[in-house]
């Protein structure tokens, strides 16, 4: 029997409110998960509205069965980085009224030890979002060079001890391969001297491996550009990030597309001409969860929501 894990959608009301739902609009939930955000969007859509959800996790696709009788809903099995391709295949490019992206790992993924995402639960070192394809974390750790591991840990996990940890992994795998999450987490805890308060020593390394295995930052970049390409004028983009690497990408993307093209000083270009190149308008400042939400759901603590609106296309 399949074990069920509860998932609480983060910043639910704020994220959907940011989409400014129109009853007959067309919306994308690029990270379906267990359907919390999708359910809220469907509640606000009218009978002629439409929601296209995307997820590469087979368990998320199975969870989408809850909406099988709702003709306004459809699910696509794939990565959110390809959302523009899916929209183009449906003939809806430039007609999307809102795109929602939640970059967090869902609670069911973290809580299911068999998925291998958690350093707190012993399970196989997998970490693939789509566990039907691709290289597992264990396979990568078995073959990666010390320099490659150190680069991944530092770049994707901002781990200060990246090189030391990489060397220790390489030394230990000579005795036995790393096949279980507990083996890797225990090694990192054992060799880490300056431990951060209230943070497991393996947090950054596990994050880094997960990001690398799933090409998450590349997917995020493609998803943001894809959302910009498919949104209709005045369409909204609501994006939830969970760590600084993600949030910096989102912040810079919105800023870059809301400021217009930079031109060398002195060129005879008017403000109006520069404004034509602006594609987005930031909708207020970043939104963080309330104290009450964090008390209900500790995993919401690091979440950040940013909202932007698509400006009219250049004539």
UniProtKB/Swiss-Prot annotation:
The keyword NAD does not apply. One of its GO terms (biological process) is rRNA base methylation. Pfam families: Methyltransf_5 (PF01795). It catalyses: cytidine(1402) in 16S rRNA + S-adenosyl-L-methionine = N(4)-methylcytidine(1402) in 16S rRNA + S-adenosyl-L-homocysteine + H(+). InterPro entries: RsmH, SAM-dep_MeTrfase_MraW_recog, SAM-dependent_MTases_sf. Keywords: Cytoplasm, Methyltransferase, rRNA processing, S-adenosyl-L-methionine, Transferase. Its EC number is 2.1.1.199. GO terms for molecular function: rRNA (cytosine-N4-)-methyltransferase activity. Signal peptide: none annotated. Specifically methylates the N4 position of cytidine in position 1402 (C1402) of 16S rRNA. NCBIfam families: 16S rRNA (cytosine(1402)-N(4))-methyltransferase RsmH. This is Ribosomal RNA small subunit methyltransferase H. It comes from Shewanella pealeana (strain ATCC 700345 / ANG-SQ1). The gene is rsmH.
């Amino acid at each position: 029997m399949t074990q069920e894990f509860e998932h609480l959608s983060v910043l639910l009301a704020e994220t959907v409110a940011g989409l400014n739902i129109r009853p007959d609009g067309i919306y994308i939930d690029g990270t379906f998960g267990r359907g919390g955000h999708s359910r809220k969007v469907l509640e606000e859509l009218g009978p002629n509205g439409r929601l296209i959800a995307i997820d590469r996790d087979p368990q998320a696709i199975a969870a989408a069965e809850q909406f099988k009788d709702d003709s306004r809903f459809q699910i696509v099995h794939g990565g959110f980085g390809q959302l523009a391709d899916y929209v183009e295949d449906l003939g809806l490019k430039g007609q999307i009224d809102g795109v929602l992206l939640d970059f967090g790992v869902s609670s069911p993924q973290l809580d299911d030890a068999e998925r291998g995402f958690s350093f707190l639960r012993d399970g196989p070192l997998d970490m693939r979002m789509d566990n039907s394809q691709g290289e597992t974390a264990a396979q990568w750790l078995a073959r990666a060079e010390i320099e490659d591991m150190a680069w991944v840990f530092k770049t994707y996990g901002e781990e200060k001890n990246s090189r030391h940890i990489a060397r220790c992994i390489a030394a230990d795998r000579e005795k036995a391969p790393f096949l279980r999450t507990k083996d890797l987490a225990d090694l990192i805890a054992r060799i880490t001297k300056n431990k951060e308060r209230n943070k497991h020593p393996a947090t950054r390394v596990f994050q880094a491996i997960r990001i690398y295995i799933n090409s998450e930052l590349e997917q995020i970049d493609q998803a943001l550009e894809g959302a910009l390409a498919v949104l209709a004028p005045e369409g909204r983009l609501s994006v939830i990030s969970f760590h600084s690497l993600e949030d910096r990408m989102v912040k810079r993307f919105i800023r870059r597309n809301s400021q217009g093209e930079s031109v060398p000083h002195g060129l005879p270009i008017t403000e109006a001409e520069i404004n034509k190149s602006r594609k987005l308008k930031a909708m207020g400042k970043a939104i963080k969860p309330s104290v009450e939400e964090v008390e209900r759901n500790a995993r919401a603590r690091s979440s950040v929501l940013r909202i932007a609106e698509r400006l009219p296309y250049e004539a």
